[in-house]
C-alpha cells in the first residue's frame, strides 16, 4: 500500500504492515531520536486501526507518587476517549490500569486490535519497574494468547527502551516480536521531502539544510516554501526564541540527569574531531567509571554522538564525537550568543561559516558511508577509521577517513572538502596530500601488501589542473544523494 504522506521509511512500513496481517499477536518496540517521526509513522500506517492509544507526558512532579498518578489519570482519560464507560473506576496503580485496558479490549470485536503506547519512558516514569512488570504481565497472561493483538510501544529515550524493553531480562524477556529503530532521513529522502512540499532547492542548498537541521522531519516541517533557505534558517534559529528550549528538549526527559548530558554535548560541540574518554571526563569534571560510561552509551544509542577509532603512532584511541547536526549548528552559532534577525545572511560569508561548513560536511559524508561505498564499488568495508601520524617534516598529518577493503587489498584515503564551486587543489595542498600519503604508507596501520586510493569527496567536484594528478577517485554531492 502506498502512503503519499510518508517520505521513505519503506522497510519500516513493510514491517508494520506485516504485523497487521499476522495471524498471531505481535509486540513491537519503536525507538529513535526525539522529533524523528516515530509517532507519525505509526499513526499514518495504522490510521483508523488503532483501538487504544495512550501517550506519556513529561512532567515535573514533587514526588514519584504524584508523577505516577498523573500518568495513570492520563491513561484513564485515554480509555474514556476510546469509548470505555464513564462510570469505570479510576485506576490507582498500573495493575488496575492494565486490567481496565483488558476489559475494554474484550468488548471490541475487530479482526485486529492495535494498542499504541507512545512515549513509554515518560508513561512508566523514573521508577519504571512497576509499570514494566504490569505491562509484561498484561502481555504474557492475556494479550499474547489472543492472537489478534498488535501492541506497539514507542520511546525517544533510546537507552531506556533498550534497557527496559528490548533487552529486558524480566517479564518482557524474549517477548518482543519486532523492533524498529527509526533513523533521520538521508539526503536522498530529504530531497524527496523538499520536492513533495513544493521546495525548489539546489542540492547544494539541500546539503546546507541537512547540515543545519539534520534529516529530522519535525524540523523540516517547520520550513516555509515561500521563503528562501536563508530566510528559513533565520526564522528557525535566529528569530525564534524557543530555539534555546528546543535544544534543551532534545535532552530533557530523555535522561534523568539531563544537565550532565548537556555538559558533555556542549563540551564535545567545542571539539569537532572529538575527545577521548579521559579528555572528556576531565573537561566536564566527572569521574571515569560506570556512570560516565552509561552516559556515553546513552548518547551513542540515541544517535547524538558516535565513537570511532583513531589510529596514532603508538596506539589506537576511541574518540567520542558529536554527530547530531541540529546540536552542532546550535552550539556553533547560537549558544551563548543570543539571537539577531538576519544573522544567517551575514554569517554565510564569514570564517565562522566556512569553519562550520567544512567540519559539518565531513560528518555529512561519514553519515552517508553506504553511498560512498556504492560510488567506490567497495563490496565490504572491513574497517573505517581516522588516522593520525607524523609527516616527513615532523608535522602531524591526519586523514579523516580511511576505508579498508581487504578483499581488494586497498585502503581508500578520503579527503572531504566543502565548497560552493569546484574545489581547487593548489600547490600547497598538493604538497600536504603528498605528505599525508607518505606518512600513511610508512605507518604501522598500513598493510604493506595493500595499495592506496586517494579519494576526494567534495560538493561540486575537483577542478582539473596540474596539482590534482594524485587524485584517484572522486565522490560528489550528487553521489551522496543516491
Predicted stretch roles:
Residues 5, 311, 318-482:
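A cross-kingdom feature that marks ATP-driven nucleic-acid transaction machinery
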Amino acid at each position: 500500500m502506498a502512503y503519499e504522506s510518508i517520505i521513505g521509511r519503506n522497510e519500516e512500513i513493510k514491517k508494520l504492515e506485516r504485523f497487521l496481517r499476522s495471524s498471531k499477536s505481535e509486540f513491537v518496540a519503536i525507538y529513535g531520536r526525539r522529533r524523528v517521526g516515530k509517532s507519525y509513522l505509526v499513526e499514518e500506517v495504522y490510521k483508523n486501526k488503532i483501538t487504544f492509544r495512550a501517550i506519556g507526558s513529561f512532567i515535573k512532579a514533587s514526588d514519584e507518587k504524584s508523577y505516577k498518578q498523573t500518568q495513570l489519570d492520563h491513561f484513564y482519560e485515554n480509555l474514556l476517549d476510546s469509548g470505555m464507560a464513564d462510570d469505570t473506576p479510576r485506576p490507582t496503580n498500573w495493575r488496575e490500569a492494565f486490567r481496565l485496558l483488558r476489559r475494554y479490549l474484550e468488548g471490541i470485536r475487530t479482526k485486529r486490535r492495535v494498542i499504541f503506547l507512545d512515549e513509554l519512558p515518560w508513561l512508566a516514569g523514573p521508577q519504571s519497574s512497576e509499570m514494566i512488570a504490569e505491562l509484561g504481565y498484561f502481555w504474557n497472561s492475556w494479550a499474547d494468547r489472543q492472537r489478534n493483538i498488535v501492541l506497539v510501544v514507542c520511546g525517544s529515550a533510546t537507552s531506556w527502551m533498550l534497557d527496559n524493553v528490548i533487552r529486558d531480562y524480566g517479564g518482557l524477556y524474549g517477548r518482543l516480536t519486532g523492533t524498529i529503530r527509526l533513523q533521520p532521513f538521508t539526503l536522498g529522502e530529504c530531497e524527496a521531502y523538499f520536492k513533495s512540499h513544493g521546495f525548489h532547492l539546489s542540492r547544494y542548498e539541500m546539503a546546507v539544510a541537512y547540515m543545519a537541521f539534520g534529516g529530522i522531519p519535525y524540523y523540516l516541517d517547520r520550513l516555509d516554501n515561500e521563503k528562501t533557505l536563508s530566510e528559513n534558517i533565520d526564522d528557525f534559529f535566529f528569530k525564534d526564541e524557543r530555539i534555546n528550549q528546543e535544544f534543551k528538549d532534545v535532552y530533557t526527559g530523555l535522561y534523568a540527569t539531563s544537565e550532565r548530558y548537556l555538559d558533555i554535548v556542549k563540551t564535545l560541540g567545542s571539539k569537532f574531531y572529538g575527545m577521548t574518554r579521559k579528555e572528556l571526563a576531565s573537561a566536564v569534571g566527572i569521574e571515569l567509571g560506570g556512570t560516565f560510561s552509561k552516559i556515553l552509551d546513552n548518547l551513542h544509542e540515541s544517535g547524538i554522538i558516535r565513537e570511532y577509532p583513531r589510529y596514532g603512532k603508538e596506539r589506537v584511541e576511541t574518540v567520542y564525537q558529536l554527530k547530531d547536526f541540529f546540536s552542532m549548528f546550535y552550539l556553533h552559532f547560537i549558544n551563548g550568543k543570543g539571537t539577531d534577525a538576519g544573522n544567517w545572511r551575514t554569517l554565510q560569508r564569514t570564517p565562522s561559516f566556512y569553519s562550520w561548513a567544512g567540519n559539518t560536511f565531513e560528518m555529512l559524508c561519514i553519515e552517508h558511508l553506504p553511498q560512498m561505498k556504492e560510488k567506490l564499488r567497495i563490496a565490504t568495508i572491513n574497517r573505517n577509521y581516522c588516522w593520525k601520524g607524523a609527516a616527513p617534516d615532523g608535522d602531524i598529518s591526519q586523514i579523516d577517513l580511511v576505508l579498508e577493503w581487504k578483499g581488494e587489498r586497498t585502503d581508500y584515503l578520503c579527503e572531504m572538502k566543502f565548497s560552493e564551486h569546484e574545489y581547487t587543489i593548489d600547490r600547497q595542498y598538493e604538497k600536504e596530500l603528498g605528505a599525508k600519503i607518505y606518512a600513511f604508507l610508512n605507518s604501522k596501520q598500513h598493510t604493506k601488501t595493500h595499495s592506496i586510493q586517494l579519494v576526494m569527496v567534495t560538493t561540486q567536484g575537483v577542478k582539473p589542473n596540474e596539482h590534482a594528478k594524485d587524485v584517484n577517485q572522486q565522490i560528489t554531492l550528487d553521489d551522496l544523494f543516491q
